[in-house]
Amino acid sequence: MPTAGKASWRELLRQGEHLLRRRARPDPCEDAGTDAFLLMQAAGGPDRSHYPLQKNDPCPPTLREKYLALLRRRAAGEPVQYILGEWEFMGLEFKVGPGVLIPRPETEQLAEQAIESLRGRPKCRVLELCGGSGCIAVSVAKALPAADITVLELSPDAMRYLRENIARHGVKNVTAIQGDALCPPPGIAGPYDAILSNPPYIASGELAHLQKEVQKEPVMALDGGGDGLKFYRGFNTIYPKMLAPGGLLLYETGEEQGEAVAALLQKAGLREVRILRDAYGQPRNVLGYAPEKP
């Protein structure tokens, strides 16, 4: 890195990107440029709106050292989201850190689909399973303020972030309950107008082959059992019967799991079962509806 006190922000940013690309081998940082900029900003550097005017300004030595420390953490494989302590989902900022699954852009499709499906039921009851940081529930609650939303989460670490994010966004219509989604506590009872989940769906044997950053996330939020379908099978015996007539069951799935999960929903008697593809054409969500009253 350049000599302390003499480097401009532009020089530091270029050096930071180089450091991430070089030290992240053999698992390279695909977004080295973006990560280097975000960490520079977190260290006290200019944001994107001010960078063009300030990029040639010298960086104070104290901020340079702070930036270097953040870069080293990222180069060692720590997710940039954990380093920053928050991440955006559906235009909202959520607190994240070790012990909770990081919100991902592809999961926004689940939240968007839920909101679209429930707009005609403004006072709906919604249950989310394996709620993690609360990004899905809070996003739905902000869009549907009259909805009554319950979030079930087992992990004590994730519950801390879940409750903090509920409070942070001031959504009074979201209730967090700690419990096992495969053995729901007594407070979980239908009928629900929608049941949503982004459950663990990575096959156990694949966990060791995940990217270094993903391996820093909690195993219990990733491990879906031998074939990745453990939670879908377990949910299938519990939650379809908790749906109100015409109620929605909506899951996120792995790219190779759509057909298997759709078959489970059909087996449970749901109708209009569909597999939804993401922006890249990959299967991403499976949904189905409870039968209407005869």
Please describe what each predicted stretch is.
Residues 1-48:
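Non-catalytic accessory regions of SAM-dependent methyltransferases
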Residues 39, 77, 107, 136, ...:
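Residue-level signal for inorganic ion chemistry
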Residues 40-116:
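Conserved AdoMet
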Residues 81, 202-205, 256:
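Active-site beta-alpha loop architecture of Rossmann-like, nucleotide-cofactor-dependent enzymes
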Residues 106-208:
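Conserved SAM/SAH cofactor-binding pocket of Class I
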Residues 201-231:
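Mobile active-site "lid"/loop adjacent to the S-adenosyl-L-methionine
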Residues 226-290:
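Conserved Class I SAM-dependent methyltransferase catalytic core
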